[in-house]
């Protein structure tokens, strides 16, 4: 759609009035302090409370607007639990509509995963006891309300869930939450002239906004000591995939993916992050000045002016977070460990191969829309399966109750950033996965596998999986 003559004149006037304002969005120089979500740690016998409610939040440090979230703020606190603990979690719904919740990446039985069988009505609670029996990982909790997942997550029903174990606590890597270990929940939104979020789902595909937010802030910065900084990245956007790099070219050292640590750190110049994916990276801030983690290209001046008059899905600014080193370099600095854990060893044979085709203009998986009364896949706990997933329209794909290794992408090698055990992957044409089922589910409480373009999931690109407990 082209600008009318009147709109062009108005836009030109705005540009002239901007004076010394930069014409293109800069990739450095954060403006707002990074909000760090409060940390809730599970203690033996002490429940974790997560109350869903309305709140008020400013996305730009100015006017506050109505949002959703947990415990009185936008988004939710970071929950930290420990392997081998049994965590009592109390979800309280103080909103005016039903919500279901899940913890993506947490390896628990289907009856504890949430979803359609665990709807939380207004002014009601759900109190599962979660047995944490997995290695350290960065997971996330979020709404997965049937047919309402996209607006519920967009409104603010999401937060990070960290699993720690003896290995994660002993590794020589940053682990001081909010000091050298930062959670980054990345979203894109469309804001009105008063800074209030707008949401108009498209008829096909997924929603994309023009404003990049991190922990609910635009263009944030954080001051860090000179040395290694750990960033726990979560893409909580409805549909947008990001390609990340540092503004000054320094490498991102990838140490963990969805389901935990890689065998060894990987130095990458750039990496992608699809909706639902989590990655942990280390950045060396011992040398040089401030540097900004960026996400692709920013809008040009004409694209930004056009956005004044019509909705845009081109990001005004690509800045995720600016790191500002302060102080002197310590006399003794930690070196990056050469190894993080042992190599992955597959202790079983592939039991069968399955193929899945994700819907594009028409939702569904293998041509079938989600039906809560239908089981689409039946398997057994302890099995490995080969899954070939195809998508003509690029989109992320997530599996509950399982973990997988990406074996190939479009018939070629797996991108380095997709190494290690995962539960979410970007599908652009074909990916081959080696899937391991470690938890059991039932027809009453099945696991889901689905498109993580949330609007696609809401339209029916979800299917159900039952993993029967092994007889051994």
UniProtKB/Swiss-Prot annotation:
Coiled-coil spans in chain: none
Main location: periplasm
Alphabetized UniProt keyword annotations: Cell cycle, Cell division, Periplasm, Signal
Location(s) in or outside the cell: Periplasm
GO molecular function: copper ion binding; oxidoreductase activity
Position of the signal peptide: 1-27
Top-rank taxon: Bacteria
The record's account of how the chain is modified after translation: Predicted to be exported by the Tat system. The position of the signal peptide cleavage has not been experimentally proven.
One Gene Ontology biological process: FtsZ-dependent cytokinesis
InterPro entries in UniProt: Cu-oxidase-like_N, Cu-oxidase_C, Cu-oxidase_fam, Cupredoxin, FtsP, TAT_signal
Any matching Pfam family: Cu-oxidase_3
GO-annotated cellular components: cell division site; outer membrane-bounded periplasmic space
Family: Belongs to the FtsP family.
Job of this protein: Cell division protein that is required for growth during stress conditions. May be involved in protecting or stabilizing the divisomal assembly under conditions of stress.
NCBIfam families cross-referenced by the UniProt entry: PRK10883.1
Protein known as: Cell division protein FtsP
């Amino acid at each position: 759609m082209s600008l009318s003559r009147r709109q062009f004149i108005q836009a030109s006037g705005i540009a002239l009035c901007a004076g010394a304002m930069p014409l293109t969005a800069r990739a450095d120089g954060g403006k707002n302090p990074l909000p760090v979500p409060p940390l809730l740690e599970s203690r033996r016998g002490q429940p974790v409370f997560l109350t869903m409610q309305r709140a008020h939040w400013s996305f730009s440090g100015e006017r506050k607007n109505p949002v959703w979230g947990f415990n009185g703020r936008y988004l939710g606190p970071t929950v930290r639990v420990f392997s081998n603990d049994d965590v009592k979690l109390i979800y309280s719904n103080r909103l005016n509509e039903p919500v279901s919740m899940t913890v993506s990446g947490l390896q628990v039985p289907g009856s504890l995963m949430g979803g359609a069988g665990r709807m939380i009505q207004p002014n009601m609670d759900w109190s599962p006891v979660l047995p944490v029996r997995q290695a350290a990982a960065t997971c996330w909790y979020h709404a997965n309300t049937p047919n309402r997942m996209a607006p519920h997550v967009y409104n603010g029903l999401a937060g990070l869930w960290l699993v720690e174990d003896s290995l994660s606590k002993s590794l020589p890597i940053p682990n001081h939450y909010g000091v050298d270990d930062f959670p980054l929940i990345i979203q894109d939104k469309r804001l009105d002239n008063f800074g209030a979020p707008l949401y108009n789902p498209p008829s096909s595909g997924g929603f994309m906004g023009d404003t990049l937010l991190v922990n609910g802030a635009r263009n944030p910065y954080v001051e860090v000591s000179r040395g290694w900084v750990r960033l726990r990245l979560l893409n909580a956007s409805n549909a947008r995939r990001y390609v990340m790099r540092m503004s000054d070219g320094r490498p991102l050292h990838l140490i963990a993916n969805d389901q935990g640590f890689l065998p060894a750190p990987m130095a990458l110049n750039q990496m992608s992050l699809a909706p639902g994916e989590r990655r942990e990276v280390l950045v060396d801030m011992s040398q040089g000045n401030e540097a900004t983690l960026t996400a692709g290209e920013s809008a040009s001046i004409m694209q930004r002016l056009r956005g004044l008059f019509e909705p845009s899905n081109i990001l005004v600014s690509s800045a995720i977070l600016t790191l500002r080193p302060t102080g002197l370099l310590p006399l003794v600095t930690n070196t990056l460990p050469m190894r993080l854990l042992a190599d992955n060893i597959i202790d079983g044979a592939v039991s069968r191969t399955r193929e899945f085709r994700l819907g594009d203009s028409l939702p569904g998986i293998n041509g079938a829309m989600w039906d809560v009364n239908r089981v689409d896949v039946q398997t057994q706990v302890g099995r490995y399966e080969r899954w070939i997933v195809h998508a003509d329209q690029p989109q992320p794909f997530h599996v509950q109750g399982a973990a997988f290794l990406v074996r190939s992408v479009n018939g070629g090698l797996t991108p380095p950033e997709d190494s290690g055990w995962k539960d979410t992957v970007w599908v652009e044409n074909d990916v081959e996965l080696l899937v391991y089922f470690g938890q059991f589910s039932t027809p009453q409480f099945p696991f889901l596998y689905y498109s993580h373009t949330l609007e696609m999931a809401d339209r029916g690109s979800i299917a159900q999986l039952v993993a029967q407990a092994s007889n051994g």
